[in-house]
Amino acid sequence: MMPIKTFVSERRAANLLAQIRWRNGVYCPSCRAESVIRYGSYRVFQRYLCKDCDRTFNDQTGTVFEHSAVALRKWFLAVYTYIRLNTSIRQLDAEIDVSYKTVYRRVQRFLRALDAPRPHLEGPVEIDEFYVKAGLKGRERDQPSRSRGLSTRGRGTYAEDKLPVFVLADRGTGERHVIPAKAATESRIRLLLADRQQESLTVYTDGFRAYDPLDEDDAFTREYVVHGDGEYVNGDVHVNTCESHASLARRWLSPHRGVSKDRLTPYLRAFQLRREVFRKPGKEALKTILETAL
């Protein structure tokens, strides 16, 4: 159930922000000192004074919600529906009655605050890649129009506006990671698999040639299926989990038409967060979403 009371009361929204922001204790955002005292209020937010640097701040200072004339409850509704319901920014513009540019800037600021995925692999691990068409949307037209003829053969790259996105499915922990790259190369694959708990990590892949060097590396035990030969499952060897997760990622990107390749990473981090809160009740999901960005 959606946490409706938080979305209609500015006081409740402010209290929730303070609860999450200072969950490890109040400190000064400027000098990080903990010697602070209450110092009046600013609108519905508690104000503080730092005894070390003599600066004042409030519950919003230093967060993605600071310096905004829009009510905090509206921003809570925006980030909640954006993550939980995959609502487009154009639709949020209508729902919270705030201009498109204002919503876009604030949502982008929220997305940039999300942590990058750091896979710590236990294994066995499935790894696969899919490709996302992402161009130069949002940039000034400083170059001639590109040809719209038939695409060239081969795998996509950042330069060709078709970015590879790797999906890692750790069967040991059940975690899924979606990580974009500029190219699907051996070096990038090794970097993704570098943080592992075992000396020899079991890796399941398809027949893509970039994975072939793993066969000669003692740090990996690679097993694979060749889709081109009609082979998709061979006992425990398959990448079906990755392909299923990739289809969910494509569906996530669908309402956000024409994502720029320079901004694809934050959108995929939002997708990762959505998978974390998917089964949580409304209030708990909102807390998790805010904790991730604060």
Swiss-Prot record:
Cited Pfam families: DDE_Tnp_IS1595 (PF12762), Zn_ribbon_IS1595 (PF12760)
Tree of life domain: Archaea
InterPro entries the record matches: Tnp_ISXO2-like, Transposase_27_IS1, Transposase_Zn_ribbon
GO BP term, example: DNA transposition
Keywords from the UniProt entry: Plasmid, Transposable element
Protein name: Uncharacterized protein in transposable element ISH50
